[in-house]
């Protein structure tokens, strides 16, 4: 009997200390929900952590944002993630994905439609507005127009074949005998006939003076006009024979072939260039936006986009330039981030709302999952607390036995 007095207290202290700590640790998480009897909530239900999970979530978020994810740490993390090599690799990957997308006919069609809408908006909307704004400047297109005049129009000369074709077109389409006859009739008005007769009388000399003052040109010109009006077919035949007799096609061909702006005086060339520039500028100011918009509406932009994408898909220069393009873009981003990364991170942190994200994530975690996660992290530490409780209980029992021995 005396033996039980010395054995029971240490064993009882061991059992009580061990299981008391084990129960206390389990009561941190369990029960997971509240239990009620006749509407009265049983104390210690739910467990401490499930009962205070919202406050715990806010405290965890506050601790993480205050100690771990500070703006300085996020800034340093962003600099590590956005190193030039990583950005270049990411940009190269994106460009590779874009090129691979062009190889797929269905995706190429979708890309062509998107590109067509972009080109149409650029040409039909943005470009007319840009021309309208730029046209207000006095020097609008002055350099390109002058360059066009100096390098193209000033050097332009027709070769023999071009001059021959142009002369044939002029004589057959622009100035056939019928048109010449009508122009001659329109020119020979009474006023013009009087002016020609007076000019001939004043300027004629020698034998021509005698003819001019005795006969004059008035009657002859009146008869010519009357003949052209009353006998149009005969007048046209005479004009046609006259053109053949003077070999008009050959003469006109020679004139056109020798025609060049370089043969004109310098002052005339400058005046012509100025007039051309002013005419183009005035036309673009008044009609340019409408002309560009109308031209854009007449273009099949989807077809143009398909041609552009097809050319890009088979472009060896583009494929060979991917590395260089990605490197250049990465350097541009690096320079931008070096200057504005800190301010950018200060703007991003409130937008990300990381503390609320962390709190919502903790609140969304079930008590069982939360217990399992904590147990995985501190399982050994929690078991050590349980064992320590048993050890302390055993020691208390031993102390009690010592008191009994005294």
From Swiss-Prot:
It is found in: Cell inner membrane. It is a multi-pass membrane protein. It comes from the Bacteria. InterPro entries: DUF445, UCP032178. Its main location: membrane. The chain crosses the membrane at residues 1-21, 385-405. GO terms for cellular component: plasma membrane. Belongs to the UPF0754 family. Keywords: Cell inner membrane, Cell membrane, Membrane, Transmembrane, Transmembrane helix. This is UPF0754 membrane protein CYA_0973. PANTHER family: UPF0754 MEMBRANE PROTEIN YHEB (PTHR35791:SF1). Pfam families: DUF445.
């Amino acid at each position: 009997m005396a033996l039980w007095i010395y054995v029971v207290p240490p064993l009882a202290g061991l059992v009580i200390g061990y299981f008391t700590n084990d129960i206390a640790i389990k009561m941190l998480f369990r029960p997971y929900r509240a239990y009620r009897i006749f509407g009265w909530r049983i104390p210690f239900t739910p467990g401490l952590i499930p009962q205070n999970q919202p406050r715990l979530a806010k405290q965890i978020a506050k601790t993480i944002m205050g100690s771990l994810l500070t703006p300085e740490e996020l800034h340093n993390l962003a600099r590590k993630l956005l190193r030039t090599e990583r950005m270049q690799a990411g940009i190269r990957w994106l460009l590779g994905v874009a090129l691979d997308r062009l190889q797929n006919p269905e995706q190429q069609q979708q890309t062509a439609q998107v590109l067509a809408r972009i080109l149409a908006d650029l040409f039909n909307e943005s470009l007319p507005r840009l021309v309208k704004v730029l046209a207000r400047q006095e020097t609008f297109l002055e350099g390109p127009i002058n360059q066009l005049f100096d390098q193209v129009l000033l050097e332009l000369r027709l070769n023999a074949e071009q001059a021959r074709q142009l002369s044939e077109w002029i004589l057959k389409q622009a100035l056939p005998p019928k048109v010449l006859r009508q122009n001659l009739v329109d020119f020979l008005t009474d006023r013009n006939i009087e002016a020609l007769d007076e000019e001939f009388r004043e300027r004629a000399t020698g034998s021509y003076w005698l003819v001019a003052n005795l006969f004059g040109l008035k009657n002859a010109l009146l008869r010519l006009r009357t003949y052209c009006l009353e006998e149009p077919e005969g007048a046209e035949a005479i004009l046609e024979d006259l053109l053949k007799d003077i070999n008009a096609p050959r003469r006109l061909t020679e004139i056109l072939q020798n025609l060049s702006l370089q043969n004109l005086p310098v002052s005339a060339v400058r005046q012509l260039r100025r007039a051309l520039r002013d005419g183009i500028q005035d036309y673009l100011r008044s009609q340019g936006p409408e002309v560009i918009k109308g031209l854009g509406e007449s273009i099949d932009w989807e077809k143009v986009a398909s041609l552009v994408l097809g050319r890009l898909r088979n472009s060896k220069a583009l494929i060979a330039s991917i590395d260089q393009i990605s490197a250049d873009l990465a350097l541009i981003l690096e320079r931008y981030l070096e200057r504005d990364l800190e301010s950018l991170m200060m703007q991003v942190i409130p937008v990300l709302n990381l503390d609320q994200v962390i709190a919502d994530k903790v609140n969304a975690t079930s008590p069982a999952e939360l217990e399992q996660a904590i147990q995985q992290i501190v399982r050994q530490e929690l078991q050590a607390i349980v064992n320590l409780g048993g050890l302390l209980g055993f020691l208390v029992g031993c102390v009690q036995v010592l008191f009994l021995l005294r």
